[in-house]
Amino acid sequence: MKPFLFLATRSDDEPADAEYEAFLKRTGLEESTLRRLRLESQSLPQIDLDDWSGILVGGSPFNASTPPEKKSATQKRVEAELSGLLDRVVEADFPFFGACYGVGTLACHQGAVVDTTYGEAVTAPEVTLTEAGLADPICAGVPKVFQAFVAHKEAVTTLPPHAVVLGTGEACPVQMFRI
């Protein structure tokens, strides 16, 4: 199996390492099959999609909905690099999993509205899979209703027409989606 690429953007080592460990544990992958690249400290190199099984993007201190004039130079660079990569990922229908900042980044890239309307404090709300979610391979083996830990300063308010909602919640209507 080709490895997966985990793109991280957390500058503090402790939460960055904890997030990577959580992805390793929950995916069942090992460091050799989930390679981490920390974009807050280095530029994204040229990525050949043929070298990877898929790409994962986790959380961040960055917010996709921050006005451009308030974004740091690092955030602007990271977002420009991710946007270029997402152009290729979406065009190739390449496996991509976004959590937290990864959701906001992909959503903004695809023309969604991401703002603080449906932000959630640290909690574990019930997420309900839609009919599309129940039929989607990414949700295979997941119960129709499950609890998920969340902590979103921002969330998707409106998806573009070509996106499909896979999971919804009472306080945040778009918990999971597919492009």
Regions found by a protein language model. Give the residues of each.
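Cofactor-binding loop segments of dinucleotide-utilizing enzymes, especially the Rossmann-like FAD-
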Residues: 9, 39, 101
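Glycine/Thr-rich phosphate-binding loops of Rossmann-like dinucleotide-binding domains
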Residues: 14, 64-66, 107
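Extreme N-terminal starter segment of soluble prokaryotic enzymes
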Residues: 1-6
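Pocket-forming structural segment of enzyme catalytic cores
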Residues: 110-179
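Gly/Ala-rich beta-loop-alpha elbow adjacent to hydrolase catalytic centers
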Residues: 98, 102, 107
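Flexible gly/pro-rich beta->alpha loop and the following alpha-helix that scaffold active-site loops
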Residues: 32-97
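Glycine- and acidic-residue-enriched helix-capping/strand-helix junction motifs
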Residues: 11-19
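A short, Lys/Arg-enriched amphipathic alpha-helix followed by its capping loop at the start of a domain
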Residues: 22-32
